[in-house]
């Protein structure tokens, strides 16, 4: 089982490549889940890329990243454990990204594969919808990275999280991140912004997902992702069995909340 002290990570996407650590006391951060990296560099989507309200954030970054080859040559040096995040648009791309990453895998605490980005044309979603292909990919990646702690990042669209968790367990993976953003739409005056929905509005969905998965597979490692903006939010995710609490879009609102949650997680008895 992966152990982080405190059991709190800055989530892939908002955390970038660890830049937000400069804004907080890293003693209260257990680790950083780095920005998702793909086989080829991605420029991301055109602006506007973000929109928010009191209850949600819509982002359509589009997995902007330098590509896996540039990434392995410029791995950030951070004072906390790093978890890599890898993505792809096809079976072959996921496999090639894993092969390149394998050269530096021992520098990371774990590696997450993003199978659920809603802001790019494919982003792994099409593979997850094809159960047999996804199971084949999970098996192949497990064999490619036999010594890594493997985490699958999934959403709630295209597959039931309990089924996704079962595939992850049966193929020898170690954990799952629940949940990624869901598709949303926001109007900024007359501009329509389509992207991934996150923030407080996502918390009830994420809580239910974590609850259902841990009820059925208590031994599966779960990173809770979705609407953690306060100590109370973190407490509720612990109650449904989350092993690690992820903080994402809250970083845009108030990075200071990370220290508050981190202090709580260091003190709480589990």
Curated annotation (Swiss-Prot):
Alphabetical GO biological process terms: 'de novo' pyrimidine nucleobase biosynthetic process; 'de novo' UMP biosynthetic process
Keywords: Cytoplasm, Flavoprotein, FMN, NAD, Oxidoreductase, Pyrimidine biosynthesis
Compartments it resides in: Cytoplasm
Enzyme Commission (EC) number: 1.3.1.14
Chain sites annotated for binding substrate: 35, 59-63, 114, 180-181
Domain of life of the organism encoding this protein: Bacteria
One GO CC annotation: cytoplasm
Major site of localization recorded for this protein: cytoplasm
Residues annotated to bind FMN: 12, 35-36, 114, 153, 179, 199, 226-227, 248-249
Pfam annotation, one family: DHO_dh
Cofactor: how bound: Binds 1 FMN per subunit.
PANTHER family: DIHYDROOROTATE DEHYDROGENASE (FUMARATE) (PTHR48109:SF1), DIHYDROOROTATE DEHYDROGENASE (QUINONE), MITOCHONDRIAL-RELATED (PTHR48109)
Assembly behavior: Heterotetramer of 2 PyrK and 2 PyrD type B subunits.
Family statement: Belongs to the dihydroorotate dehydrogenase family. Type 1 subfamily.
Protein's recorded name: Dihydroorotate dehydrogenase B (NAD(+)), catalytic subunit
Species of provenance: Thermotoga maritima (strain ATCC 43589 / DSM 3109 / JCM 10099 / NBRC 100826 / MSB8)
């Amino acid at each position: 089982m992966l152990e982080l002290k405190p059991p709190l990570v800055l989530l892939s996407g908002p955390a970038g490549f660890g830049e937000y650590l400069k804004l907080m006391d890293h003693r209260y951060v257990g680790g950083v889940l780095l920005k998702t990296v793909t086989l080829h560099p991605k420029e991301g989507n055109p602006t506007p890329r973000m929109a928010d309200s009191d209850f949600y954030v819509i982002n359509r970054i589009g997995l902007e990243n330098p590509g896996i080859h540039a990434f392995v040559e410029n791995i950030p040096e951070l004072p906390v454990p790093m978890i890599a995040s890898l993505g792809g648009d096809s079976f072959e791309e996921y496999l090639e990204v894993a092969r390149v990453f394998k050269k530096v895998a021992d520098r990371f605490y774990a590696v997450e594969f993003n199978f659920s980005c809603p802001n790019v044309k494919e982003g792994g979603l099409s593979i997850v919808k094809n159960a047999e292909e996804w199971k084949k990919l999970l098996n192949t990646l497990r064999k490619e990275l036999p010594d890594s702690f493997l985490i699958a990042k999934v959403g709630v669209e295209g597959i039931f999280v309990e089924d996704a968790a079962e595939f992850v367990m049966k193929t020898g993976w170690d954990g799952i991140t629940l949940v990624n953003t869901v598709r949303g739409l926001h109007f900024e005056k007359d501009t329509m912004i389509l992207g991934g929905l996150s923030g407080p509005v996502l918390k009830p969905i994420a809580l239910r997902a974590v609850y259902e998965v841990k009820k059925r597979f208590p031994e599966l490692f779960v990173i809770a992702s979705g609407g953690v903006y306060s100590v109370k939010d973190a407490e509720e995710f612990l109650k449904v069995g989350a092993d690690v609490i992820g903080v994402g879009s809250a970083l845009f609102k108030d990075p200071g909340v990370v220290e508050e949650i981190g202090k709580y997680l260091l003190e709480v008895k589990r």
